[in-house]
Amino acid sequence: MISQPTLQKLSNFEDKSLLIVDDDNPFRQRLARAMEKKGFTVTQAESVKVGIETVKSQSPAFAVVDLRLNDGNGLEVVKEIQKVNLKSRII
C-alpha cells in the first residue's frame, strides 16, 4: 500500500520563500498576490533565465514553475532548484 504524504501547515516551515516562474504576467501576478495572502514571501520570474538567476541568489523553499516558457523549458529552472536546495517543494 502506498502511503499518502502528510499535509503540513505553512506555519510549520521556517522558510516561506516561494518562487513563481511563469511568462503569463497576469496569471503570475494573481497567483503571487494570493500566495502572499497565505503567508508566503513571493519572488516572481518571467523566464528561464530570470528564474535560474533568482534561484542562484535566493534558493527558494517552494516553487511553482511553468514548464513551457518563451525562452526555454521550465525544467531547467527545476534542475537548478534541485541543485541548490534538495528540500524545495516544486510544482
Regions from the PLM with identified roles:
Residues 44-62:
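Acidic, metal-coordinating helix/loop segments flanking the phosphotransfer/catalytic sites
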Residues 44, 69-72:
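Residue-level signal for the "D+5" position in two-component response regulator receiver
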Residues 22:
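Conserved acidic carboxylate
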Residues 66:
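Active-site residues of response regulator receiver
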Residues 25-43:
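Two-component/phosphorelay signaling modules centered on CheY-like receiver
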Residues 1-19:
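Non-catalytic signal-transmission and effector/linker regions of two-component phosphorelay proteins
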